[in-house]
Regions:
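Surface-exposed loop/interface segments of Gram-negative outer-membrane beta-barrel transport/assembly proteins
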Residues: 1-59, 75-185, 233-298, 313, ...
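Solvent-exposed loop/turn segments connecting transmembrane beta-strands
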Residues: 211-216
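Alpha-helical support elements that line or immediately flank enzyme active sites
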Residues: 60-66, 78-82, 305-307
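Outer-membrane beta-barrel "beta-signal"
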Residues: 224-228, 361-363
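Transmembrane beta-strand segments that form the barrel wall of outer-membrane beta-barrel proteins
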Residues: 201-210, 368
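Active-/binding-site microenvironments in catalytic and ligand-binding cores
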Residues: 316
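Structured alpha-helical segments in the cores of large, soluble enzyme domains
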Residues: 185-195
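Glycine-centered tight-turn and secondary-structure capping sites
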Residues: 300-304
Length: 480
């Protein structure tokens, strides 16, 4: 189902439930127009079209491991995932009433190939001495690469509905191709030590380089550290072990990076379009050579407890997370490009703003009954999180999250200072209009051009009984 608003799924969702699949004569039933747009019978649509999708996928994982000296293990791993996809869709000539018909068939052939591999090598060293000192260290590197390419051809007016191949005669509707990829290289190290299973310390650092960022900002560096104290192993706790057999305090700090964006946004990409004089090119996006890693820091403290020899366990975690240099697409005026249609110049991806998250998690697990034939375990989880946009490039900056083209790019969410991330933005509903008198007396939702300042009462282009009534939140001069 690759047809968007004309696909089987969306047509089934929008079809009125009182419309039958067949009429009394056994023909396909269904309205021919809804608010001026064609409405397809989804069952007929599913049977009329041929939409074949085939995938050949090969995956594998290999490793070599060696222990050259006591306590030291060296391991190298390699994994890959290769995929070939073939999609063919054929729409024959058809007639479905007076509005939905076509005397021209159409075929679409789409091929895609993708490859992902990861190669990781690391060494682990562990040593214990005097029965109380436990030391561990790890050093390694990792490389990953993803690449994908594809092509698509659409033709219409084939001489036969039977021979459904793209090399048949017909007229080209469109042809397109794409190729993309990304790569990452990483180095990492970790050291951990504990004394007598009482005091624990861990330190980690990793450096990551991503092809998604410009030459000056490919590398990001991310440290972390953790401390823990197992109080239940202290001698002064011995008298309480019958009731509480585990009591551990934890604290940690860590930084992680985010590179979840499309490739090559630090440079300007080019797109093609057809003209009467041949193929033309236009800049697809505004470049940002200073694009860099988004970084998040988190501080957390926690406690682990077990009672009655593990029958009851309690874990509490409190955390504070702060993200900076967020990877967001800047909002720019339409005359600079960056509007919401697909053929405009995309606004630049930039690093801006800060967000914060704070909260706690509580987990209680009880092992109520443990029997050979019956086990009963209960688990209670309580979580509380509060997030906030602390800063943007200016306090008045707003980034809209728009629904796709089929809904006119309406704004559904917003990112703005002082609000949670991605807060829903829209009208406030106050119920449904019951009659025409209510519509005429209500604040204007659709202005009547012939009677300005009053709602237009119209079933398709205005407001009608049964439509949603929106709350008027405007203040002086229309400002909320």
């Amino acid at each position: 189902n690759n047809d968007g608003t004309d696909g089987v799924v969306l047509q089934a969702l929008t079809m009125q439930p009182n419309i039958p699949v067949y009429d009394f004569d056994g023909n396909w039933a269904g309205p021919e127009s809804v608010n001026g747009a064609s409405q397809y019978n989804p069952v007929w649509l599913a049977q009329m079209k041929t939409n074949d999708f085939k995938r050949n996928r090969t995956m594998g994982n290999f490793y070599l491991s060696a222990d050259p000296v006591k306590g030291l293990n060296i391991r190298t791993e390699y994994g890959f995932d290769y995929s070939d996809n073939n999609n063919r869709c054929f729409i024959p000539t058809y007639s479905f009433g007076t509005l939905i018909s076509s005397d021209t068939n159409q075929i679409m052939q789409r091929e895609e190939h993708s490859m992902y591999w990861i190669w990781k090598t690391y060494a682990n060293y562990n040593k214990t001495w005097n029965g109380k000192h436990n030391f561990g260290a790890m050093l390694g590197w990792e490389m990953t690469k993803s690449s994908w390419n594809g092509s698509q051809i659409v033709k219409k007016g084939l001489s036969s509905d039977i021979v459904q191949i793209v090399t048949q005669d017909g007229e080209f509707v469109s042809n397109s191709g794409w190729k993309d990829g990304s790569a990452m290289a990483s180095a990492f190290a970790r050291v951990n030590y504990n004394y007598d299973e009482k005091y624990y310390v861990t330190a980690t650092v990793r450096a990551d380089a991503s092809s998604k960022f410009g030459p000056n900002n490919k590398w990001g560096y991310f440290p972390s550290a953790a401390l823990a104290w197992r109080i239940s192993n202290e001698s002064f706790f011995e008298g309480a072990r019958n009731a509480m057999n585990e009591f551990k305090l934890r604290a940690g700090y860590g930084m992680v990076g985010n590179s979840s964006i499309d490739s090559y946004l630090y440079s300007a990409k080019m797109s093609t379009f057809n003209t009467p004089y041949g193929t033309g090119y236009f800049m697809a996006n505004i470049a940002n050579p200073n694009l860099k890693w988004e970084a998040s820091e988190q501080y957390n403290v926690g406690v682990d407890m077990e009672f009655l020899r593990g029958r009851i366990s309690l874990t509490i975690d409190a955390y504070y997370k702060r993200s900076k240099d967020l990877l967001l697409r800047m909002t720019i005026p339409n005359y600079l490009g960056g509007s919401t249609t697909y053929d405009d110049i995309a606004a630049p991806m930039v690093n801006m703003g800060r967000t914060s998250n704070r909260g706690f998690d509580l987990n209680i697990t009880t092992h109520n009954i443990e029997h050979q034939k019956f086990n009963w375990t209960s688990n209670l989880v309580i979580s509380l999180n509060r997030n906030n946009v602390d800063a943007m490039n200016s306090d008045s900056s707003v980034i809209n999250g728009n629904i796709d083209w089929w809904s006119g790019f309406q704004t559904a969410t917003r990112i703005m200072v002082g609000q949670p991330m991605g807060v829903f933005y829209g009208y406030v509903a106050e119920g449904l209009f019951q009659n025409e008198e209510e519509i005429l007396a209500a604040p204007v939702q659709v202005n009547d051009a012939n009677n300005p300042g009053v709602n237009l009462v119209n079933k398709t282009t205005g407001v009608y009984p049964g439509d949603i009534r929106f709350k008027d939140i405007s203040g002086p001069d229309g400002v909320p």
